[in-house]
Amino acid sequence: MSTNQSNSVIGKLAIFGTSGFAYEVADVAVSMDIEKIILLTNEKDFDNVDERFEVLHESEVSNLVEQGYQFAMGIGEPELREKVFNKFNDLEYPNLIHKNASLGYGQRELINKSQGNVITAGVAMTNNIQLGNFCIFNLLSTVGHDCIIEDFVSVMPSVNISGNVKLEKGAYLGVGATILQGQLDDKLTIGEGTVVGAASLVRKSVPSYKIVVGSPAKILKDISK
């Protein structure tokens, strides 16, 4: 899935989703001076114009491609993002990086090796962070050095991820969660599909498909695959 992106200008962007996060993605696009922004829905009945952006049905995707649109995911849930990608996997998904995000030396070039990531206002990433595809980093979240973040990870507002952490595919970190430091050769790992509850403090690795909550975080229950 990985792709090596250029720094070409995005002129037209269609965002999958019409929920609140889709509008936050649109905010990122506005900060990047993207001139034409529309939202896409899979609902049969919808208003095609609101006060901010035109809304179209996703059946219009092929027409939008012909018009030169690129695409983004305005969907917070990892599984739904992956579902949409599997349905529309041949589109061009640029990375969206808010102008007020902070990236360490060389980090933008690393991000450009991936696709479909959304980095919102106030996010801070240091350096040598390996980023997968279609991840979201919400307001004021931070990512430390030498982290590995796989596809479809969701990082909610004010999450702090220390250095040498690995987030496996589809992990979801709730608002204000903190992930403590791992080791360069033994990273603290949040397993595939695992959910870390809001304001939780994770001090050690967590297996896949678990819900963990608390400070320190403890396993609350398993998640059905």
Regions found by a protein language model. Name each.
Residues 10-29:
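Glycine-rich adenosine-cofactor-binding loop
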Residues 150-151, 156-225:
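Glycine-rich hexapeptide-repeat left-handed beta-helix
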Residues 71-74, 119, 213:
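Redox-cofactor binding/interface segments in oxidoreductases and associated redox assembly factors
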Residues 78-87, 91-147, 151, 159-161, ...:
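Left-handed beta-helix
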Residues 45-104:
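Phosphate-bearing ligand-interacting subdomains
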